[in-house]
Curated annotation (Swiss-Prot):
Enzyme class: lyase
Cofactor(s) needed: Zn(2+)
UniProt organism field: Bacillus cereus (strain ATCC 10987 / NRS 248)
SMART domains: Aldolase_II (SM01007)
Catalysis performed (reactions): 5-(methylsulfanyl)-D-ribulose 1-phosphate = 5-methylsulfanyl-2,3-dioxopentyl phosphate + H2O
Gene symbol of the encoding locus: mtnB
Name the record gives this protein: Methylthioribulose-1-phosphate dehydratase
Pathway this chain belongs to: Amino-acid biosynthesis; L-methionine biosynthesis via salvage pathway; L-methionine from S-methyl-5-thio-alpha-D-ribose 1-phosphate: step 2/6
Any Pfam family: Aldolase_II
């Protein structure tokens, strides 16, 4: 029970911080944190909640299938399947899915992936070589959630990572809440920088292919 309360508090603090950045517009986005490994349980945001508010109904505890552990009228977020795929296939401890203008714009500039390089903040992703390059996959935003989940699952390759969904934000996961939030902040910085650089250079013709 102590672990449940500890993780609830941790996830609530992350929600508050990301809310101040306006990364949950119009109730969008979902976040989760692992509570136990065996059996697998995790807290995840309830569907349709205003994340600028803090209430006792912000999160619910679900199992490895994303099914609520306790009887509740709350529904887990629509994209819970993405979280279950991550937790069932890695040792990740926290998953953050947010919609920002920048990460949506990026998915309209590129088709299958975006490549970013030679930025100091890439070290926040535990990549230390000079002039490092990263590739972030972009998948289509299927309305059929099982199809979306299956396409997403193909890009889960470790205890930390990120996948962009076209016009549907980014999902980032990490070893724990600190790691996941750090990675999310790094990706969002990189997206913002990249878009600003393209605008200064004269648009997508200098560095990206418009995809729409």
């Amino acid at each position: 029970m102590k672990q449940l309360f500890r993780q609830w508090y941790d996830l609530s603090e992350i929600k508050k911080e990301l809310t101040t950045r306006n990364w949950f517009p119009a109730t969008s986005g979902n976040i989760s944190i692992k509570v136990s490994h065996e059996p697998l349980t995790f807290l995840i945001t309830a569907s349709g909640k205003d994340k600028t508010k803090t209430t006792p109904d912000d999160f619910l505890l679900v199992d490895h299938l994303g099914v609520p552990v306790l009887e509740t009228e709350l529904r887990p977020s629509a994209e819970t399947i993405l979280h279950t795929h991550i937790y069932n296939n890695t040792n990740a401890g926290c998953v953050l899915h947010v919609h920002t203008t920048d990460n949506n714009v990026i998915t309209n500039l590129y088709s299958d992936a975006v490549t970013l390089q030679n930025q100091e903040i890439i070290k926040a992703l535990d990549i230390w070589e000079e002039g490092a390059t990263i590739n972030i996959p972009i998948i289509e935003n299927h309305a059929h959630i099982p199809t979306l989940g299956e396409n997403f699952r193909k890009h889960i390759q470790g205890d930390s990572g990120a996948v962009l969904i076209r016009n549907h934000g980014i999902t980032v996961w990490g070893r724990d809440s600190f790691d996941a939030k750090k990675r999310l902040e790094a990706y969002e910085f990189l997206f913002q920088f990249h878009i600003k650089l393209l605008s200064i250079q004269g648009g997508v013709s200098n560095g990206a292919n418009s995809y729409s």
